[in-house]
Amino acid sequence: MYGIEYTTFLIYLISIILLNYILKSITRMMDYIIYKFLLIVTITSIVVNAQNYGINLPITGSMDTSYVNATKDEPFLTSTLCLYYPTEARTEINDNEWTSTLSQLFLTKGWPTGSVYFKEYDDIATFSVDPQLYCDYNIVLMRYNSSLKLDMSELANLILNEWLSNPMDITLYYYQQTDEANKWIAMGQSCTIKVCPLNTQTLGIGCQTTNTGTFEEVATAEKLVITDVVDGVNHKLDVTTATCTIRNCKKLGPRENVAVIQVGGADILDITSDPTTNPQTERMMRINWKKWWQVFYTIVDYVNQIVQAMSKRSRSLNSAAFYYRV
């Protein structure tokens, strides 16, 4: 009798001990699984929230449409604005403190002191040779001149778009333009460009390849030339290389951190008819004021609206690198 009770008690005791062991094992296993899961979740959340600097994400969509001015000024606290103006503006204003005055006025629009830079250039022709657009946002003021309107249009086409350019060795090779986005861009103190189209036997069409005097002249003594010829046809070129550099360039798209403001003029500069301009709305505007103070006051008033039609996520333009996309 006592032996049976003792055996039963022993079985219960062993069962309890075994059950306790199993429960502890399950608890330890669950703790391990839970801790591991939490660790994975923590690491994953950190990776997901972090910015991936190893991938160059493409800029999608267009920033060329008009946007309603934002009420927030915070984005401008870390941005820089360059304002390019001709020498005649400073000469007319004739005030040594005029840039300081404008800086204080820009401050009222949310642009901190020191974030706006004033860049002076002599004239359109000189600026065409050495355009350097380094700021997050760049606004170029161009006084309209009927005798320079073609130069102004070419300059606007250059700085409002990104170009991928390669050197051209015109002494050794013939060149052809593959499509409408392919142009030859020349810069220098004096660029005279002549072309001779060739047939499939590399003989001149209406010209002699050995006589540059028979070539068609497409530019004469200009500082900036964007040359467009018939696509898919080889050409032999003659360029004043001593005073001019020419490159084979491809238009990649809009340079969205640049805007051009035409000052005055009965005609409005328009480069949107170029079939390679996509979208057809460019960051080009016109201000009709006779006095430069009025021009700058208007710029200050509408600077945020102008910037909202731009994007700081564009590459800088430096003619020292001959407007490569860098």
From Swiss-Prot:
Residues annotated to bind Ca(2+) 1: D95, G206, T214, E216
Any one GO cellular component localisation term in the record: viral outer capsid
Positions of the UniProt region annotated as LVD motif: 237-239
Localization, UniProt: Virion; Host endoplasmic reticulum lumen
PTM statement from Swiss-Prot or TrEMBL: N-glycosylated.
Leader sequence residues: 1-50
Protein name per UniProt: Outer capsid glycoprotein VP7
Species, as recorded: Rotavirus A (isolate RVA/Cow/United States/B223/1983/G10P8[11])
